[in-house]
């Protein structure tokens, strides 16, 4: 596939890989990010993106699939956060801060002690221009899996996202859908490590969804628009970084931040310019 696009656009294959990877990442981030933003779980997303680091290290050390190992740690972190919040008077944001810092510190120690080929900078900040074909295929199948799962459980995720109390009244297992979302979030986080790294993955999850939220009130429209915004900022940001020799992940995030800023002032929900004109 990449060879065809490389000949068609007269670009190196690694640039084509980066572009396709950015599109896959942008779309899947838009889908998952929409639920994260609606549920007001941006901090939880940040926590899980850091909590998977020990799983990444152990996967390398024991030669197991990184998606499997890191996702287990992501779910474990989500369970711990829920348990601490429910079984004590400690609020969820405090529990998130504790788990985030603890798991992240453990991951750094494991990486520093493990005699493996793990590059900490690569894990933290990513390098989308160095994505191999195997990871590109992995990103594609993660996207396909997320689309299938969200399509199958869309109604349940919709209801539980807007009103958990009503969800329980209808007999929905809200904990199941919460952890299903956390599992998808963990898998998406792991699959995006090589592209944008742990530090900036939360930006890919939140910025497109938050921008989309400013323009629409319907979840399906929010998901579609967030996916388009995510794919566009990924593709254009990658191109800008390639042409100007800039850090790719930072260029993608800054471009997305600019789009959000414009939307914040121009969207119908805020009507900033209209308010200024009326006053």
Model regions: which residues?
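Small-residue-rich segments of transmembrane alpha-helices in multi-pass membrane proteins
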Residues: 51-61, 98-110, 130-131, 174-185, ...
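Helix-loop-helix "hairpin" substructures at the membrane interface of multi-pass membrane proteins
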Residues: 136-208
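Transmembrane helix-bundle core of multi-pass membrane transporters
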Residues: 4-17, 88, 95-155
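Loop-to-transmembrane alpha-helix initiation sites
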Residues: 18, 66-74, 93-97, 140, ...
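Short juxtamembrane and helix-loop transition motifs at transmembrane-helix boundaries
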Residues: 4-13, 27-38, 55-65, 158-166, ...
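Transmembrane alpha-helical segments in multi-pass inner-membrane proteins
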Residues: 201-250
């Amino acid at each position: 596939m990449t060879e065809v696009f490389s000949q068609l656009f007269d670009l190196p294959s690694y640039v084509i890989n980066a572009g396709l990877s950015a599109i896959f990442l942008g779309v899947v981030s838009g889908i998952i990010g929409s639920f994260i933003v609606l549920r007001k779980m941006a901090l939880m997303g940040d926590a899980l993106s850091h909590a998977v680091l020990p799983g990444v290290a152990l996967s390398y050390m024991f030669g197991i699939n990184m998606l499997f190992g890191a996702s287990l740690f992501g779910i474990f972190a989500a369970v711990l956060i829920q348990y601490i919040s429910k079984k004590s008077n400690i609020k969820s944001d405090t529990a998130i801060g504790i788990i985030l810092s603890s798991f992240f510190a453990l991951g750094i120690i494991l990486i520093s002690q493990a005699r493996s080929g793990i590059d900490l900078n690569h894990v933290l900040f990513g390098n989308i221009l160095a994505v191999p074909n195997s990871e590109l295929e992995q990103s594609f199948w993660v996207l396909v899996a997320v689309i299938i799962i969200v399509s199958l459980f869309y109604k349940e995720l919709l209801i539980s996202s807007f009103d958990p109390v009503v969800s329980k009244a209808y007999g929905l297992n809200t904990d199941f859908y919460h952890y299903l979302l956390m599992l998808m979030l963990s898998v998406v986080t792991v699959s995006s490590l090589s592209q944008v790294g742990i530090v900036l993955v939360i930006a890919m999850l939140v910025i497109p969804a938050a921008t989309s939220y400013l323009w629409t009130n319907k979840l399906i429209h929010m998901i579609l628009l967030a996916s388009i915004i995510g794919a566009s900022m990924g593709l254009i940001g990658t191109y800008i970084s390639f042409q100007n020799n800039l850090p790719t992940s930072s260029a993608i995030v800054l471009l997305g931040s600019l789009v959000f800023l414009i939307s914040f002032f121009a969207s119908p929900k805020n009507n900033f310019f209209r308010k200024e004109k009326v006053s």
